[in-house]
């Protein structure tokens, strides 16, 4: 979508055919400067390029004879395509959509319209002479190939010396792949599978770094709970995730200073810990991001809810209620079969059965002997049995504040007693 910048120039992204009838389109950033009487295109937005990086192509507006929509016969497989006729040469360009196509055609026709000067104006001849001598120098710029590197977070372009035409052909596919990857209007449904909530909005924006304050192009994705940005559209793991519950305000950045002063379509996302400065490609894109983030934050405040995957995480969290609700069933599953069978056959006498807590006896109290013990004491475990069943009843051992006294008789039961049970023998 073309927009007007601070210098009253029409700017925007278009795809231009590399060579006529080649069918190979490259992504470029176009600037229609009516004051300089030329149409320039760059590798990217000049604000994002290194200092001194010039245009990769240019065309004088006085050489343009006609701008029209390409017919299906000219470009049958290229939608939203229009052609610029200039100096017996045709430039085929592809827009993003139908409205973008119409706006560019009208702007170029309006800028290249021939105006008849008033009588007695001599500077027109000198202007024409300047225009005639300028194109040869401008046309030499696209012949220079650059190698783009990121050194210390700064984009550096180094000219490459070429021996013949093979070097240019070899480096063009890499540049072409990089440019196609930076498109902001390609849908994301086919590249990265959505594992979380559905996306509300996604696209490329330019973000300011936190440490070096450098500007880098990142792929942003907004859903119902977070806003994430990735290094490229194909990445699965985001570089950073901003929870919407931490977003305090999102609005257009009107008060600018320093590096922010030259940034168009700039908005800021204010959170509790940091302010993010993000630059969109057009004013419409900027307002769309602001409205989308604001609506998502408002919806989260009015109807607070958790992501759908939080329930599955809480099930595996240690110490959760689902694990502690049935400790006996989990422990019983982990017992060996032999020990479990032994515990079942001696259920009346094992220490794992429920017993109330016994308080600490006073110093003057005399401990009960085995002969005078009450009848319930017969169900207490023997000294030998307490060690055998200690593994099973480690979590439910009855509290004893005083060690047991040694027994006079090794066998506490009377075999002549008629009330003795066979399970205790």
From Swiss-Prot:
GO terms for biological process: positive regulation of cell-matrix adhesion. One of its GO terms (molecular function) is laminin binding. Residues 363-375, 400-410 have a biased composition (Basic and acidic residues). SUPFAM superfamilies: PH domain-like. Residues 310-331 have a biased composition (Polar residues). There is a cross-link at residue 141 (Glycyl lysine isopeptide (Lys-Gly) (interchain with G-Cter in SUMO2)). It comes from the Eukaryota. It is found in: Cytoplasm; Cell membrane; Nucleus. Residues 7-113, 198-298 form the PH domain. GO terms for cellular component: cytoplasm; nucleus; plasma membrane; protein-containing complex. Its main location: cytoplasm. Residues 310-425 are annotated as: Disordered. It is a peripheral membrane protein. Binds specifically to phosphatidylinositol 3,4-diphosphate (PtdIns3,4P2), but not to other phosphoinositides. May recruit other proteins to the plasma membrane. Binds MPDZ and PTPN13. This is Pleckstrin homology domain-containing family A member 2. The gene is Plekha2.
